[in-house]
Amino acid sequence: VGRVHYDLSTDFFEAMLDPNMQYSCALFAEGDDLGSAQLRKLDWICERVRLRPSLRLLDIGCGWGGLARYAARHYGCQVVGITISREQFRYAQRWCRGSDVEIQLRDYREVTGRFDRVVSVGMVEHVGYKNYRTYMRTAARSLAEDGLFLCQGICGNFSRVHTDPWIERYIFPNSMLPSLARLTRAAEGVFIVEDVKNIGPNYDPTLLAWEKNFRSAWPRFADRYGERFRRMWRFYLLSCAGAFRARSLNVFSIVFSKEGSAIGSSVRDERQAVPSSRTAVLESIGNCAPCELHR
């Protein structure tokens, strides 16, 4: 999948995505454009794992480095990001230069070192059901005893061992959408679930914004990719938007702590407090009405 999908030209993704190169579900409030909604998502993720200066953060599946760069610059963290895409690796290395970020080209199972926080956004869809347990154990091995792990990704409503054949063939080879049940089962005896949020309704407007950007930018890429690719890519974006609107797909954001860790009790307590001015963004989440954005 790294070669087939994520190694498409970086300028193509730059044209479709927001300035922070976020290729995952945004978090919309009324009046947000794509860029604002993706910034809201970045802050929300950083606050969910209680980032603060000097913490070491591992970003599993860091993409083009947007979250890693944001966490280092706005939360003062030391970040290691990993990706299996050579295009993403080269781009992220350049883009994160000057920030306290190290980008590595490696499989998540090869990660070394210990981190105060681990995040994995939009990557678990590429793990596969046979490897969910390994994925959880790898995150646990990489996490400090009092750390937090955030796993966020697209989930189906049923536990399956296959994926949509069209998506498998043309868009994401070897991909598989987990269910929430599968992920939490894989974490049994490894992690404690501290919090779960479903932000899936926000993916419909995210995908529609990408499709709009894609259509606007298409004249620049028509000669390079051709009409067949244009039809395929629009079908991918719009069919996925329809699946989220129909609630066939969801996006679960799960915060885990290690079994026996004392940090879990304070996670729930601190949800009632505002530890920094940046968490003001969270107050608006309760007022979000993502489904109304379709009207």
Segments predicted by a language model, with ranges:
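Substrate-binding/catalytic lobe of Class I Rossmann-like enzymes that use SAM or dcSAM, i.e.
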Residues: 154-264, 271-272
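Conserved class I S-adenosyl-L-methionine
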Residues: 54-61
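Conserved SAM-binding strand-loop segment of SAM-dependent methyltransferases
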Residues: 98-108
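Conserved Class I S-adenosyl-L-methionine-dependent methyltransferase catalytic core
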Residues: 1-48
